[in-house]
Amino acid sequence: MATKIRLQRHGRKGYAFYQIVIADSRAPRDGRFIERIGSYNPNTNPATVDLNFERALYWLQVGAQPTDTTRNILSREGVCLKKHLLEGVKKGAFDEAAAEEKFQAWLKNKQASVQAIKEKDSEAARAEAKARLEAEKEANKAKAEIVAKKKAELAAAEAAKQAEEAAAAAPAEEAPATESAE
């Protein structure tokens, strides 16, 4: 039977996530499958992959053909490298201990690079949030200055109006008093 390792779409419109399945190549994309070996969520950063490593390796060894995207996923998870190393052991290029040592070194390096990417992304997010906060503080400061200036203008206008009314009221009171004195 011609088997494929393929993605089976789930989720909703605009927010797809996938099951990684072993299926007959003649079956429809989201139809019947032989075995589910993992899931893939491209909506997270970095994309989340939950994979049964041993079963994926088994199916690759018995001849299941991965699709392009699943080949990239399996390669990123190290399944393709492990298969390659095990084929080298079968051919006698090196022993199984050396193959396992190479795989563990690759895995450690891969995990370190993924961790560095996550740290870089989180640092960039923190820097962006800090920059937004500073910009907001500057904008609030500018708004506060404008409001204070308007309040000062209103207070000055009110004081001028009060002084004008007081000046108008004082001569009016004095004028009748001087007329009556004559």
From Swiss-Prot:
Belongs to the bacterial ribosomal protein bS16 family. GO terms for cellular component: cytoplasm; small ribosomal subunit. InterPro entries: Ribosomal_bS16, Ribosomal_bS16_dom_sf. The lineage of its organism: Bacteria, Pseudomonadati, Bacteroidota, Bacteroidia, Bacteroidales. The keyword Ribosomal protein applies. Signal peptide: none annotated. Coiled coil: none annotated. Residues 158-182 are annotated as: Disordered. Keywords: Ribonucleoprotein, Ribosomal protein. GO terms for molecular function: structural constituent of ribosome. The keyword Ribosomal protein applies. Pfam families: Ribosomal_S16 (PF00886). This is Small ribosomal subunit protein bS16. GO terms for biological process: translation. Gene3D superfamilies: 3.30.1320.10. The gene is rpsP.
